[in-house]
Each structure stands twice: as C-alpha cells, then as structure tokens.
A protein has these predicted regions:
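Catalytic cores of nucleotide-sugar-dependent glycosyltransferases that transfer UDP/GDP/TDP-activated
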Residues: 1-206
C-alpha cells in the first residue's frame, strides 16, 4: 500500500485546468504550486492517492467549476470541495470565522477508513489552522507550508507607514499570525522555499 496524502488549499479559485492566475490576490502562485505538486505526487509509485480540499463556491460571478463537489486532476488525484461560510466567493481574510466549521466537517469525513490520509499538508495560515485542528483531533501527521508569513507582512507594512488598526481591518493580521503559531506548534514537518525564509522569517515565531 502506498501513501494517501491530503492537501488543504482553502482560499482563492482552485480547479484542475485553466487556472485564473492573477484574477485577484488570492489566486496566484500558491494555486499553481499546489496543483503542480499534486500532479507530481500522483505520478510517484509510492503514492496511492492524493487529494486537495478547497472551498465549494456558488457564485454567479465565478465559474460553475468551483461549485462541483468533486473534480479529477489526474489518475489517483482529485479535488474535494467543502462548503463553509456563505455560498459566495470571499477573500481569504473573511474566511476565519468559518474555518472551525470546515474542520468539523473534515473530522467526520476523514474518520472513514477509505478517506483517512497518512499525511495532511496545509498550505498558508488558514489551511494551517484547520490542519492543526485535524492533526490534534485525528492523530494524523501534519506538514505545513506557509508560502508567506503574517509576521513578515506585518513588519513590511508597518515599515512602509501602515498602522496596526489598518492591518487588522484589512488583513486580520493577528488571526493570521495566531493561526501560523498554532500550525507551527503542531507541524511534524515545515517546508520553506529558501534559506532566507527559514532563517529570517520563521525565526520570528516561537
């Protein structure tokens, strides 16, 4: 038996084809990164199954593709969409109140033997928060990739003249940093892209 892997990529617009890169700030490089990673993993002999959990969106402003509960990516790989929060598309900063609902849904889903993965890989702070809850409740090892980090964003924006109240209103920066702290505390493995990210950005976390 090979590995069963579950990726959490919760914000933006995610599908298996014709990625809408650059449509907004939430549908960018991370979207392509996750899709290419999943395709590469699915092609490996030691991997039996790899899935991506993302948000199910019912909104006339976006493609009906994002309202499909299940979508194939490749042989042995697919997308599973779960509804949490309002039906409409939301920017990632507005998803925080609904993440525990998603975690509750996934606990029920992943308790079924046919759905339980060997590893959970969470991408970005929102998924890291959900991944930490799942890892703690189900005992499944967690991998965390931040892609970018809240403390670094906070540092740059404050240095550029921003103020704390603005950062909270626009970016929910404290929620993001708290989620990253939780994910890092529970992660069995943390993946970074560069040595600078590892040494200078993650070093700002406890």
């Amino acid at each position: 038996m090979g590995f069963r892997l579950l990726h959490l990529h919760l914000h933006g617009l995610f599908r298996s084809h014709d990625l809408e890169l650059g449509r907004d700030a939430d549908t960018g490089g991370q979207t392509l990164y996750v899709l290419e990673l999943v395709r590469s993993l699915a092609a490996r002999a030691e991997v039996d199954r790899v899935d991506v959990v993302t948000r199910l969106i019912q909104d006339r402003r976006v493609s009906a593709d994002y309202a499909q509960p299940v979508e194939a990516i490749a042989a042995g790989a697919g997308i599973q969409r779960f509804a949490f929060g309002p039906k409409r598309y939301l920017r990632k900063e507005l998803l925080w109140p609904y993440l525990e609902d998603l975690a509750d849904q996934l606990v029920v889903h992943l308790q079924k033997p046919e759905h339980r993965p060997d590893w959970i890989h969470a991408h970005y702070a929102d998924a890291g928060y959900v991944g930490a809850l799942l890892s703690r409740r189900l005992g499944i090892p967690l991998v965390f990739t931040g892609h970018s980090l809240g403390r670094e964003k906070q540092r740059r924006l404050l240095a550029g003249g921003g103020d704390h109240q603005q950062l909270e209103q626009t970016y929910s920066i404290s929620r993001r940093i708290d989620a990253e702290e939780l994910a890092l505390a529970h992660a069995d493995l943390v993946i970074t892209s560069t040595r600078q990210e590892c040494d200078q950005q993650y070093s700002r976390y406890g």
